[in-house]
Amino acid sequence: MRIVIQRVSHASVTIEGRVKSEIQKGYLILLGICEDDSTEDIDWLVRKVIGLRVFDDENGVMNRSIMDIDGEILVISQFTLFASYKKGNRPSWLRAAKHDISIPLYNEFCTKLSAALGKEVGTGEFGADMKVELLNDGPVTICMDTKNKE
């Protein structure tokens, strides 16, 4: 499981001309799921996302978490995070999980993240053509991969 976390001032996702979800200060998370991902991967990522301290304290030091600032989170499914580009110039997404695996894991991630955050996270629509708008804050962008827990 891979995520890209972007610290944002605000973000939204629009599908077919209609805003599905929007947030103010917090995280926009792009979530990629591969075939061997599990509930354990979700639990690890949720703990990391909730505990991550990348918001400034009163001294301008990144020392506050999403919980400390009462922030919001928008989660967008993003199979392209598992692009393979070893051969040729057109990427392949063979490592990305199929819908029957990825949809339940995406939903579980969002549910567990909402529970940990104490409020509903915003979501896109799995498999839809989405227009995602965001205003990066910093910018601060962090990548996490459950297969490489550094």
Model-found features: residue ranges?
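Glycine-rich, phosphate-binding/catalytic loops in enzymes
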Residues: W93
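N-terminal, polar/charged subdomain of small-to-medium soluble alpha/beta proteins
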Residues: M1-N89, A97, I103-E150
